[in-house]
């Protein structure tokens, strides 16, 4: 297990999930609004909006919140958000990619740069670390849909590239360009996915010790606390021993 998936598991074990739920809803709502503005406000005619709503439902976001976010896109006074990607380095030379939706690029860039600097990292130029990641589609299912063999069979039939299963669920990877087609094909055998999204997956992971892992966790935590930041990806890896200590 590596990178951001380890961070999520640590936060889950520490019980931090509930504390960030309201912030998560606002981030999901922002993605829904941007998706609705980018195309039609009808999820059956707008693939990005359909996936945004699906991901929001998977996080138990109330229907009223989802409807409000869609309606906000039609408002004349609605904010216009830009999609921005930041790339930089964390402690131990680890690579970090930050995706944001912002109505003020200067504010967000300043905040992200400050967070990197305070954590002993450095914000780089666009492209400075993304070459060491693959931009792929990731479709997740709960363990209850079936065992690893069943999911693997369905994934191969749907045209996916890989499947990983752990105690949290099934993670199906496919080409970014095929995300919509693969997720649709999977629904016939496995039902609706829990989440369907594009992610940055590290080609190689950088092992870090406990001290650097703690610094990285603080850095990622601070980035995710920023209202404009939607997703954070990294290529760090810690041993099971360090993971157990950090999760305590």
UniProtKB/Swiss-Prot annotation:
<dbReference type="InterPro" id="IPR048300">
    <property type="entry name" value="TACO1_YebC-like_2nd/3rd_dom"/>
</dbReference>
<dbReference type="GO" id="GO:0003677">
    <property type="term" value="F:DNA binding"/>
</dbReference>
<dbReference type="GO" id="GO:0006355">
    <property type="term" value="P:regulation of DNA-templated transcription"/>
</dbReference>
<keyword id="KW-0805">Transcription regulation</keyword>
<dbReference type="Pfam" id="PF20772">
    <property type="entry name" value="TACO1_YebC_N"/>
</dbReference>
<dbReference type="InterPro" id="IPR026564">
    <property type="entry name" value="Transcrip_reg_TACO1-like_dom3"/>
</dbReference>
<keyword id="KW-0238">DNA-binding</keyword>
<dbReference type="InterPro" id="IPR049083">
    <property type="entry name" value="TACO1_YebC_N"/>
</dbReference>
<dbReference type="InterPro" id="IPR002876">
    <property type="entry name" value="Transcrip_reg_TACO1-like"/>
</dbReference>
<comment type="similarity">
    <text>Belongs to the TACO1 family.</text>
</comment>
<dbReference type="InterPro" id="IPR029072">
    <property type="entry name" value="YebC-like"/>
</dbReference>
<keyword id="KW-0963">Cytoplasm</keyword>
<dbReference type="GO" id="GO:0005829">
    <property type="term" value="C:cytosol"/>
</dbReference>
<dbReference type="Pfam" id="PF01709">
    <property type="entry name" value="Transcrip_reg"/>
</dbReference>
<keyword id="KW-0804">Transcription</keyword>
<protein>
    <recommendedName>
        <fullName>Probable transcriptional regulatory protein RHECIAT_CH0003714</fullName>
    </recommendedName>
</protein>
<dbReference type="InterPro" id="IPR017856">
    <property type="entry name" value="Integrase-like_N"/>
</dbReference>
